Amino acid sequence: FIDTWGLIAPADPARAARYAVTAASVSHDGEGLHGAAFMAAAISKAFETSDMEEIIAAGLQQIPADCLYRKVFDAVERCYRNDPQDWRACLAMLQAEWGYDKYPGVCHIIPNAGVCALALYYGRGDFARTIELASMCGWDTDCNAGNVGTILGVAVGPQGIDECYRGPINDEIVLSGISGYSQLQQKAVRTGLPSGGREMPGASGAGWDAAL
């Protein structure tokens, strides 16, 4: 659910992170709030640039330098710098040093933050490759692929998402409740309502229209 805050605060990572932390505080604390801030800020930054390292840096700027969320990202980055091709070696490192056995509960955020970092680095700005890596790594596959998919979807725009992903969905969505959507495949509706009527910063990346 945290993706929303990056989407309504384009090109403003700090505001996106602030909204995300406020919302996430209802059900999360600690590292969960850092994860919310990172994801929302990264999505927001993706409206300005498709450079994945800039996007990651913008997200990391919104969380403490000494938190575990930042540390697992740093560990993945070191693996990537050492060998940008061998994502499996990076996954093995995550499983050995940051795996589920190191944290309480059944679905801790830190191992999954590592998977998101892996997908973002090794995916290198390719939408399909990034969500595929997030899924192939296992653990919390739906959230991980969904989070990085939102970042990449904004960064590359509709034209950067292959037809094999867009075509089957087309303009239809199946939900457990009653909802209505129009032109899901191509159209992103932006209004001034989320910003309280204030003009949003220009979102220049991936062909996004800066006008409200």
What is the predicted function of each stretch?
Residues 28, 39, 117-189:
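Catalytic phosphate/nucleotide-handling subdomain of diverse soluble enzymes
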Residues 177-212:
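Catalytic cores of secreted or luminal carbohydrate-active enzymes
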Residues 13-16, 160-162:
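Short, well-structured active-site flanking segments
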Residues 38, 59-62, 76-77, 151, ...:
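A glycine-rich phosphate-binding loop feature that marks nucleotide/adenosyl-phosphate handling sites
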Residues 15-23, 36-37, 169-171:
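Short, conserved phosphate-binding/catalytic loop or strand-edge motifs used
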Residues 2-13, 21-26, 40-138:
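Accessory "access/gating" subregions that flank catalytic or transport cores
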